[in-house]
């Protein structure tokens, strides 16, 4: 059996902290305004995984009203979300993350981002794709006010998929 989940997140720039994207500190003059570390990519990916497993959403698992998640490392949130997904009997088939940002440029960090996600999801890097695009200077991302991210996750229940082979 397979399941597909979609996640979306957005954060505005404006806080004096590192800019974390896919668990990587991307050099930039500002960080995100957020309750946690604001990693839009890992939040979108966590939401995609949680949604695919029908476990609700990231706000249900990690509410921003709970002080234990204040300045939380989003890698830890992703790992915990995936632990809960695995408890349902599913594993990652593949994930695809799209970062939507006018700046900073993501290209130099994409391989590192893929590796971080593969490590956190305990899967082969070939199961992880990260890409970046702009909105051609349109909207809030185009004006450089923040970053948006979408993610899709395919989950597989290995016991029910005889053709599945964890690479």
From Swiss-Prot:
What reaction is this protein's catalytic activity? 4-CDP-2-C-methyl-D-erythritol 2-phosphate = 2-C-methyl-D-erythritol 2,4-cyclic diphosphate + CMP
GO MF term set: 2-C-methyl-D-erythritol 2,4-cyclodiphosphate synthase activity; metal ion binding
Claim: Lipid metabolism is one of the keywords in the record: no
Q: Name one Pfam family in it.
A: YgbB
* Gene Ontology biological process: isopentenyl diphosphate biosynthetic process, methylerythritol 4-phosphate pathway; terpenoid biosynthetic process
Q: Which UniProt keywords apply?
A: Isoprene biosynthesis, Lyase, Metal-binding
Quote the record's cofactor note.
Binds 1 divalent metal cation per subunit.
Q: Where does 4-CDP-2-C-methyl-D-erythritol 2-phosphate bind?
A: 9-11, 35-36, 57-59, 62-66, 133-136, 140, 143
Which EC number(s) does the record attach to this protein? 4.6.1.12
Recorded hits in PROSITE patterns, A to Z, give: ISPF
CDD domains noted in UniProt: MECDP_synthase
Gene3D superfamilies, from UniProt? 2-C-methyl-D-erythritol 2,4-cyclodiphosphate synthase
Q: Which family does it belong to?
A: Belongs to the IspF family.
Subunit record text: Homotrimer.
Task: Quote the protein name from its UniProt record.
Answer: 2-C-methyl-D-erythritol 2,4-cyclodiphosphate synthase
- Point out the gene that encodes the protein: ispF
């Amino acid at each position: 059996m397979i399941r597909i989940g979609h996640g979306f997140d957005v954060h505005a720039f404006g806080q004096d902290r590192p800019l974390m994207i896919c668990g990587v500190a991307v050099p930039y003059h500002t960080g995100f305004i957020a309750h946690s570390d604001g990693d839009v990519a890992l939040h979108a990916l966590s939401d995609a995984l949680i949604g695919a497993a029908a476990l609700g959403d990231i706000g249900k698992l990690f509410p921003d009203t709970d002080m234990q998640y204040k300045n939380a490392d989003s890698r830890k949130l992703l790992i915990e979300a995936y632990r809960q997904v695995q408890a349902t009997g599913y594993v990652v088939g593949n994930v695809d993350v799209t970062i939507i940002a006018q700046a900073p440029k993501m290209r130099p960090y994409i391989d590192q981002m893929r590796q971080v996600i593969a490590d956190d999801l305990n899967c082969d890097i070939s199961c992880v794709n990260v890409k970046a695009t702009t909105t051609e200077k349109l909207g809030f991302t185009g004006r450089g006010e923040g970053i948006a991210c979408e993610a899709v996750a395919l989950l597989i229940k290995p016991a029910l998929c005889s053709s599945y082979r964890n690479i």
